[in-house]
Amino acid sequence: MYLSKIELFGFKSFAHRVRIHFDKGLTAIVGPNGCGKTNVVDAIRWVLGEQKSMLLRSPKMENIIFNGTKRLKPLSFTEVSITIENTRNILPTEYTEVTVTRRLYRNGDSDYLLNMVPCRLKDILDLFADTGMGSDAYSVIELKMIEEIISNKSEERLKLFEEAAGITRYKQRRKQTFRQLESASRDLARVDDVLAEVEKKVRNLRLQVRKAERLKEIREELRTLDLTLSAISMDEHLQKLRPLLDSIAAEERQCHELAATIAKLDSAHQESELRQLELERKLADAQKELNASNQLVHTLEKQLLQHKEKQKNLLQTIERLNYSIADKGRKRLEQEALSKELSEKQTPLQEVCTAQLAEFERLKKQEVELNSALDASRQALQSERRAVAELQKSLNALNLTRQSLRTRKEHLEGSVNRLDQRKRDLERSMEQAEPERRRTSEAIEEKKIALDELKKEEERLVALKASITEQSEKKKEELLSLKSEHNHLNNRIALCNSILEKFEGLPEGVAFLEKQRAGKPGLGCLSDLISVRENDKKAINAALGESLGYYLCRNLEEARLAVSSLAKADKGKVHFLILDLIDGGAKIDYAEIEGARRAIDLVETPAELSKALNLLLQHCYVVADLDAAEQLGKKHPEALFITEKGEKFTRRGMLYGGSAKGGESVRLGKKAERDRLQKQMAGMAETIAEAENALAVLRKEFSAIDTERVKRAAASISQEISALEKRLARLEAEERSGADQIAHADRERTALIASMQSVLDELEKTQPETLRIEAEIETAQQKVNVMQEELSAGESRSRALHAELQAQQGRYRDAQLDLEKHRFRASACQQTIVTLSDEIEGMQHQIARAEKEVAELGQSIAQATAEHEQAVVVSARQQEALNELESSYRDLQTKNHDTLSNLRDLRRKHDLSQQMLAEFNNRKAKLEQEIAHLQATVMERYGVELEMMPAHVPEGFDVAASRERLAYLQKQKEQFGGVNELALEEYESEKERLDFLTAQKEDLVSAEKQLRETIEEINRTALEKFRETFNQVRKNFIRIFHDLFDPEDEVDLLITTSDEDPLEAHIQIVAKPRGKKPLAIEQLSGGEKALTALSLLFAIYLVKPSPFCILDEVDAPLDDANVGRFIKLLKKFENNTQFIIVTHNKKSMASCQALYGVTMEEEGVSKLIPVKIENARSEETAS
């Protein structure tokens, strides 16, 4: 069985879908830091069900989804799948290839799939539980887990052992069982509370039944009186209603007549209104037509005015254009004359311009020749000046050097003097600080002695306090256990009392006889007179059967009295067992049968009942199971064999068995059990009181211990010591600093004196060189002055020639400018002539168009004038028709006004009639409402219809006295207060509920006992498996450790179990390699700790190997020699376990059969490159 494939998509840096195929043996995953190697390990841990994002190196779970790069967008989900070859059936499934898939979406949704079938996280965890392959098992080992395994905290080591022992399921089951036990205890407490409440309620209901019967009698009398008085009131209201109905009928007739007249007149008015509306419509249409005609007249007038105005404007435009054409023709003639004159003047101006240019060229040539000679003189002068500057620069540098040497000499002399003064000051300060340092040191020693004494006192008090706390906790746990047991006993006693007091499980007749406590005939029911151990109750229940309900009497007289009581009370029949009539002389032979117990021996009973039990249990034997009963039944056909579960078997072929629920007597031995429990409870109460007293004494002792005072004193002294130590350290540092400064000052003074001598030597050397440079500077400066005078004379001649050249250039430019002006004016005249010609031609075209448009407008004006005259005639005719319609409309409007006035008078009369009718109807409604109220009240109270009762009053019926009697009865009824009228039904219901709760309590007590037994069984089984696994791992650990280190090294695994929880153990690793004696394992080197942890892991693999193991850089702290041992260890286990190693070590890589390189060619995106080592080696050999 091995991990064959893993597929990643969108997980952390794996943006693209990646598949990794693994073979058996060793596989390495390599690559530089930060490329995403460990992301592969995180993916395997995540798909195995890891829920803590911090273990996946992420603050929240959604961060494991690829978050995008500069080029790639973030993904919306991630998916990881692993495929496991289940060839050894380690996983509890029928499939040989198991693929587990987990998806996570960015919105928080997630999916789990098992062989591509959706499932739950619990299914995944259950699949890998106790296989060594879970997300927190030892199949994935990181370097930090090595530290955790070696650390003082043993929780991680304990998890490894639990996984190897396969007790994870047991602990989970035990946890569930504990929760069920707590739930059962809470339910039992609730049932006890409810039982007490229900019993109280049943007693109250008995009183309410009697109260309800008395109230029923009062209600019957109330009903008779109330119905009679209601019938009388009904008759009085009917007599008032009859005349009112006649008045309503008369008013309704008058209303109908007025309504008919109003309707007729209203119809005529509506027809007239319709005619008026028709006239209004015609008026509107006529007005609309008249408005349209007037609008047309107005439009035509406006159009005529526009045409005339436009014609006038066009004529003015033609006149203006003719004037412009004449003016522009005159201007064109003037420009043509000017152009001819300018052309004649251009030739002489051109000749003058040529002569001025020749003179300018001659002067320009003379200036160039003179400037060349001056440039040569300037260069020579500049060269001489640079030579003088270099000499001056050398002189200045030399002078600066000498000045610097003199300044340095003065500075060195001052430094020597300051150093001498500083040395004297330091020596004086050190002498003054020595007494203070000695006093501070002595004070520190005294304070430390006092602090040690306080710490010893504090340790003593803390130890005493811890001892008292431990004793208190033990007492609390003991007291809690005692109180819990006390409550449990109390509940069991209450249950026994409930069963005994309610006579559950007894026939009706026996229960009746048991209730007669005073003067009860006989001894009582058999089930109350015997006692049986809990384990034997089922067997004795089956053996005695119905006999448990027999009623025992001493003699026949007691039995006759009991029969007589039953007959009088009609309580049915009862089986009686009369002790005097049982033949006790004949001895019953109870043969001893091997493998069976006599039933009579399992029953505790008074001596006087032994004859009855011998009779009932003769030849009854109890065996372990039904197989034993069958075998013994063949050998002893005369006997009856009963199993411990209550199954009966006889040789005659009869078998009695099945579920025990409802078929057993719940009273069997309850009385004896109650007496026994009461004795235990009394003794336990004394024990609880003693434990409470002891706890109070411990609390008093604990409160008397004042560790805070000692802590405060110690803290105060520690602060003083700290201040003194700081002061001493400061003084010592000042002393060391002073000594160092004195030594440094001596060294610095020696160096300064040597430097001063060197400065003096240098000053003497530079004096001759200074004098030589000053002489050379003076000679060179004289030569420069001569050359400067010659250059100044040449520059004067150059300036005069340049001025003459500038004047000639001005004269040439003036001649050229005159010539250009004449040329420009001639060109402008020609352009003006062309422009004027174009404008004249355009204006002539405009005049032609305007004259054409004037002719067209004349025709439009004539046509518009004719249309306007016709529109005026039509508008006049429409105005006459509108005046006739308005006259007819005013006449009809007057007539309609008169009709509407008559209608208002009639409607006013009709409204008055309706008001009278409404008043009569209100009075009628009030009477009918009172009648209906009487009927509804009677119907609501008594469920009868009032009109169906006789209306006559009985003779001698006094209405006033009856009303007083009615009020008295109602007051009596109110004095009863709240009465449960369904008390009898509720009483029967609550009684049934009480019986049900009693049975439920028994079930809970039984369940609680069974759960405690289950927890004990789980603890026992899991502890056996854990101890067996621990012993095997311990032997393997010692052997592997000796293989990796030295056989003489001291190594062991120690275990310390807890009395409170046997499965919570402390496992300690003892490892002392190469003769070292470390006080704690944390003191070992990194490599030694890593090999020790690996020894423990592989020791566990020898007991329960994981099909695959992922080692994430666990070889990082190992040197080459230890890496060799590590690889050798892996080779031993590779046949049974597949190893996947994340490593940077070359030796580890070389030992693997396959390599997977993880790179990050694109920033933020991991890429996988597979390499087969064997193929690579073959290619290397071939080459």
Swiss-Prot record:
Residues 419-442 have a biased composition (Basic and acidic residues). GO terms for biological process: chromosome condensation; chromosome segregation; DNA replication; sister chromatid cohesion. It is found in: Cytoplasm. Contains large globular domains required for ATP hydrolysis at each terminus and a third globular domain forming a flexible SMC hinge near the middle of the molecule. These domains are separated by coiled-coil structures. Keywords: ATP-binding, Coiled coil, Cytoplasm, DNA-binding, Nucleotide-binding. Residues 523-632 form the SMC hinge domain. It comes from the Bacteria. Belongs to the SMC family. ATP binds at residues 32-39. It comes from Chlorobaculum tepidum (strain ATCC 49652 / DSM 12025 / NBRC 103806 / TLS). The gene is smc. Residues 409-442 are annotated as: Disordered. Pfam families: SMC_hinge (PF06470), SMC_N (PF02463). The keyword Nucleotide-binding applies. GO terms for cellular component: chromosome; cytoplasm. This is Chromosome partition protein Smc. Residues 167-322, 358-497, 669-941, 980-1025 form a coiled coil. Homodimer. CDD domains: ABC_SMC_barmotin. Required for chromosome condensation and partitioning. GO terms for molecular function: ATP binding; ATP hydrolysis activity; DNA binding.
